[in-house]
């Protein structure tokens, strides 16, 4: 996902300050996610959960989702543009999906009994973010047309 982000930033970077800031926020979110899941070379298969990394990711996740809905989407795509309506609906559904996982798994304390369901939820968040980034990239492309 970081490679796709870098490619997008090369294509649209410098054309719109808000989009540039948004892409930087996305990069921060991805780095926090990768740190949380322990995506590092030579990592052991079962490493203990880093509570600070979880807190940092959760804060960035909520901030990123909020910024998208309350600042970015309406600012970059003209109101009522029909091609963006479907994309925006998809983003709203995606936000509900991510927040449901957040509410049910990420904001609660993790212990031995719910570790497996937490890992599955974390994977689900990663998949939902990948879907979200595709939708957001469509909005960016529409804004640049």
UniProtKB/Swiss-Prot annotation:
Example GO BP: regulation of DNA-templated transcription
Keyword field contains Cytoplasm: yes
Pfam families per the UniProt record, alphabetical: Rsd_AlgQ
InterPro entries, A to Z: Rsd/AlgQ_sf, Sigma70_reg_Rsd, Sigma70_reg_Rsd_AlgQ
Coiled-coil segments: none
UniProt keywords, alphabetically: Cytoplasm, Transcription, Transcription regulation
GO cellular component terms attached to this protein's record: cytoplasm
Subcellular locations according to the entry: Cytoplasm
Signal peptide location: none
Family: Belongs to the Rsd/AlgQ family.
Subunit-structure text: Interacts with RpoD.
UniProt function note: Binds RpoD and negatively regulates RpoD-mediated transcription activation by preventing the interaction between the primary sigma factor RpoD with the catalytic core of the RNA polymerase and with promoter DNA. May be involved in replacement of the RNA polymerase sigma subunit from RpoD to RpoS during the transition from exponential growth to the stationary phase.
Listed name of the protein: Regulator of sigma D
């Amino acid at each position: 996902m970081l490679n796709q982000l870098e490619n997008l930033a090369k294509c649209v970077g410098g054309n719109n300050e808000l989009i540039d800031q948004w892409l930087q926020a996305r990069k921060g979110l991805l780095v926090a996610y990768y740190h949380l899941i322990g995506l590092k070379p030579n990592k052991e298969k079962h490493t203990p959960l880093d509570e600070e990394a979880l807190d940092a990711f959760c804060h960035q996740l909520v901030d990123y989702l909020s910024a998208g809905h309350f600042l970015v989407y309406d600012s970059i795509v003209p109101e009522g543009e029909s091609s963006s309506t479907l994309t925006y609906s998809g983003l709203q559904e995606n936000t509900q999906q991510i927040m449901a996982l957040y509410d049910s798994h990420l904001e609660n304390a993790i212990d031995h009994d719910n570790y497996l369901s937490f890992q599955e939820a974390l994977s689900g968040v990663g998949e939902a973010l990948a879907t979200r980034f595709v939708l957001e990239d469509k909005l960016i492309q529409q804004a640049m047309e």
